[in-house]
């Protein structure tokens, strides 16, 4: 039996005493043909944009996330940006988050036209809920917790604050695919959850990709329009 570990360079194997298969960008895939056959199928069918494979991914991802909807997008960055815009976040609004994150979290807030408001973190590098309430102003529209390294934030406390002040929660779950918080999947936490399929993530694609999960029918419908320029079929376009 061939293991993934055997494909790694000798120096990497020596440094990896526990045999943990960390993401290694030059690592060979175990089953080339399974991947290539699926890619050939897509090419032959000409199913390049939002086709049947994306539909299947969304269906299965919603199932594992235990949510009503999963909406595929171009990247984790797109997922955060589109989620904010779907909630109506824009010029003059504020979003509470943490500075301990990849730039895309903050970049999405700024690109949406809003102002990031930084809250301190705890020893686990996740946002400290005890500091959130003091950051809330009349301009606050959402809380954006980052589940750093896949460890979910203290969502019980965050959801309690969000409910008290009628705020949306957009979870940056780009590290948290298949993570759980008190029996709930990371995808089911908050108003919307955003995931990344970047090659460095624990579930990745060839290139880049992302997905948004939610239980809101209204937000899901809006996001499906927004990810594709508001197009409904070929002859109708919604302007946001």
Whereabouts are the PLM-identified features?
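Generic structural signal for small/hydrophobic residues in well-ordered secondary structure
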Residues: 24, 38-39, 61, 79, ...
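Active-site phosphate/pyrophosphate- and oxyanion-stabilizing loops and adjacent acidic/basic residues
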Residues: 59, 156-159, 208
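Conserved donor sugar-nucleotide recognition element shared by glycan-biosynthetic enzymes
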Residues: 50-54, 76-80, 102, 125, ...
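Active-site region of PLP-dependent enzymes
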Residues: 5-7, 176-182, 189-240
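Structured loop/turn residues at beta-strand edges in well-structured enzyme cores
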Residues: 65, 90, 138, 187-188, ...
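PLP-dependent aminotransferase-like
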Residues: 7, 85-173, 180
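Conserved PLP-binding active-site segment in aminotransferase class I/II-type PLP enzymes
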Residues: 1-86, 90, 111, 163
């Amino acid at each position: 039996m061939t293991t993934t570990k055997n494909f790694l360079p000798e120096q990497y194997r020596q440094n990896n005493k526990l045999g943990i298969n960390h993401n290694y960008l030059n690592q060979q895939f175990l089953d080339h043909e399974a991947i290539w056959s699926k890619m050939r199928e897509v090419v032959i069918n000409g199913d390049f944009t939002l086709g049947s494979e994306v539909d299947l991914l969304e269906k299965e991802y919603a199932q594992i996330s235990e949510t009503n909807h999963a909406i595929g997008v171009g990247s984790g960055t797109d997922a955060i940006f589109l989620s904010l815009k779907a909630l109506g976040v824009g010029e003059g609004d504020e979003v509470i988050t943490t500075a301990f994150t990849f730039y895309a979290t903050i970049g999405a807030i700024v690109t949406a036209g809003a102002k990031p408001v930084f809250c301190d973190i705890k020893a686990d590098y996740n946002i400290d809920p005890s500091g959130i309430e003091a950051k809330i102003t009349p301009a606050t529209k959402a809380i954006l917790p980052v589940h750093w390294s896949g460890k979910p934030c203290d969502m019980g406390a965050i959801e309690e604050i969000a409910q008290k002040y009628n705020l949306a929660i957009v979870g940056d779950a780009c590290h948290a695919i298949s993570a759980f918080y008190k029996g709930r999947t990371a995808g089911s936490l908050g108003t919307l959850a955003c995931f990344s399929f970047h090659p460095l993530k624990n579930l990745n694609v060839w290139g880049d990709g992302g997905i948004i999960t939610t239980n809101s029918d209204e937000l899901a419908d809006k996001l499906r329009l927004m990810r594709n320029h508001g197009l409904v079929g070929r002859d109708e376009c919604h302007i946001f």
